[in-house]
Swiss-Prot record:
GO-annotated biological processes: division septum assembly
UniProt-listed InterPro entries: G_ENGB_dom, GTP-bd, GTP-bd_ribosome_bio_YsxC, P-loop_NTPase
PANTHER family: ENGB-TYPE G DOMAIN-CONTAINING PROTEIN, MSS1/TRME-RELATED GTP-BINDING PROTEIN
GO cellular component term of the entry, any: cytosol
Domain EngB-type G, residue spans: 30-204
Source species taxonomy: Bacteria, Pseudomonadati, Pseudomonadota, Gammaproteobacteria, Pseudomonadales
Protein name per its UniProtKB record: Probable GTP-binding protein EngB
Cell division is among the record's keywords: yes
Annotated GO MF terms: GTP binding; metal ion binding
Length: 211
């Protein structure tokens, strides 16, 4: 069945806008933005590329290469933002602190930010970085949706069990405000669910047909 969610067409026409090292280099703070965050090597760039059907986000065998806020335009009012990857051991500490400082500035000041997509490697979920992002989202009343990436690396049963376990842990620690799903970029698993979240946050009517 062909997905008719209106966000699909917008994602397919996504174009690179600019890279920002600091908040004052970001596009005008208006419209709708959804940011993608994740610990290094969590599959963030691959997820973005799969959702947009393009090679917009840079992928690398060396985690942590994304050092800037990268903005991708969907239309005049809507953008996706690729946030810096964190946690890679070979990144110098001063650079890590620089990334952290500007990430906090972006998250804390951006009025157009409507939601945060957090990538977790399903084999290594709930890292310290993930917990920090969850804490921030709840404290800031920011909608968050989690993609348990690389779900194809596990059997379906093991992936489902991990989903339920992480879901229970999040509900216990942070309540029901955070949604979560399985995702695999190579297998294109979970695209419909992710598109529906994006459409909701960007105030696009969900026209996906009912089951």
């Amino acid at each position: 069945m062909q997905l008719k969610n209106p966000i699909l067409g917008l994602c397919q026409q996504a174009t690179f806008m600019l890279s920002a090292a600091k908040v004052d280099q970001c596009p005008d703070d208006e419209g709708f933005e959804v940011a993608f965050a994740g610990r290094s090597n969590a599959g963030k760039s691959s997820a973005l590329n799969t959702l947009t059907h393009a090679s917009l986000a840079r992928t690398s065998k060396t985690p942590g290469r994304t050092q800037l806020l990268n903005f991708f335009g969907l239309d005049e009012d809507r953008r996706l933002v690729d946030l810096p990857g964190y946690g890679y051991a070979k990144v110098p500490i001063p650079l890590k602190l620089h990334w952290q400082r500007h990430l906090e500035a972006y998250l804390g000041s951006r009025e157009s930010l409507k939601g945060l997509i957090l990538m977790m490697d399903i084999r290594h979920p709930m890292t310290d970085f993930d917990v920090l992002m969850l804490d921030w989202a709840i404290a800031s009343n920011m909608p968050m949706h989690i993609l348990l990436t690389k779900a194809d690396k596990l059997t379906y049963g093991a992936a489902k069990n991990t989903l339920l376990k992480v879901q229970a842990e999040i509900r216990k620690g942070w309540g029901d405000a955070v949604s979560i799903q399985l995702f695999s970029a190579p297998k294109r698993m979970g695209l419909e669910e992710a598109y529906t979240v994006l459409a909701d946050w960007m105030e696009l009517e969900d026209k996906a047909p009912a089951e």
